[in-house]
A protein has these predicted regions:
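N-terminal secretory signal peptides that target proteins for export/translocation
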Residues: 1-4
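Bacterial N-terminal signal peptides
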Residues: 8-19
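A short beta-strand-turn-helix
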Residues: 23-37
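Alpha/beta-hydrolase fold active-site loops
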Residues: 37-38, 65
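Short pre-active-site segment immediately N-terminal to redox-active cysteine/selenocysteine motifs
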Residues: 38, 43-46, 161
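Structural alpha/beta surface segment adjacent to cysteine/selenocysteine redox centers
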Residues: 45, 51-127
Length: 223
């Protein structure tokens, strides 16, 4: 019980600090159709903290039965993150699960990947999943344009780091949101995220969810 109380006290303090220090504005984000609450994350496939968070996002979101919406935010100082994001989008076109699995695969092997060997890792994943890679995965730049649109959205929201994680509620505009500011302890991060989802569900409980349509959301846990 003492340990639980300490964690609870620390959680409240962290949430308060996060609310006070948050610089990003998630009010322009929207939940996907059919969802009252969603976890929305701006990620960079070369970011170590994104790798730590990736499985946690799906674990907590699945437990609360809310979708995860992934936004690409490749940082300029990372030499291969944009290329990896293009391939992630390519695998998304094959199936949502394949796109999720590719991201999980990249995050898992991130310490061994560099600009010079990225293509080898991509080819290995494609071979293991029996997906033939075309000579050019994005010949017209359409996948890159989607990535740049996500990055522009993040820039307008005032993002300063990855991952930037929001719990967003249906409503508005502006949409109700909470930014999750991570701490070193991932168990505490899980608790923070779960609490933010529960709080948002209470906040928007009486609001009707938007009608379902096809959208790019990610609900299953990545491998």
């Amino acid at each position: 019980m003492i340990r639980f109380r300490n964690v609870a006290f620390s959680l409240v303090a962290t949430l308060t600090l996060a609310a006070a220090c948050s610089a990003a504005d998630g009010s322009m984000l929207k939940t996907p159709p059919g969802a009252k609450v969603a976890v929305e994350v701006f990620e960079d496939l070369e970011c170590p903290d994104c790798a730590r968070w990736y499985p946690v996002l799906f674990e907590v979101a699945n437990a609360h039965k809310v979708p995860v919406v992934l936004h690409d935010f490749p940082l300029p100082m990372h030499p291969w993150s944009l290329d990896a994001a293009v391939y992630a989008r390519f695998f998304d076109t094959k199936s949502q699960k394949l796109g999720e699995d590719f991201r999980g695969y990249i995050y898992k092997n991130q310490p061994s990947i560099n600009k010079g060997n990225l293509q080898q890792w991509i080819q290995k994943f494609a071979d293991e999943n029996k997906v033939p890679l075309p000579f050019a995965v994005d010949p017209e730049g359409k996948l890159k344009a989607l990535i740049m649109a996500d990055r522009d959205l993040g820039s307008r929201a005032g993002l300063q780091h990855t991952p930037t994680i929001f719990v967003v509620g249906h409503g508005g505009p502006p949409s109700p949101y909470t930014e999750i500011n991570e701490v070193q302890d991932m168990e505490q991060n899980k608790a923070m995220l779960g609490q933010a989802i529960e709080d948002m569900e209470k906040k928007v409980g009486s609001v009707a969810a938007p009608k379902p349509t096809k959208t790019r959301t990610h609900k299953k846990k990545a491998s």
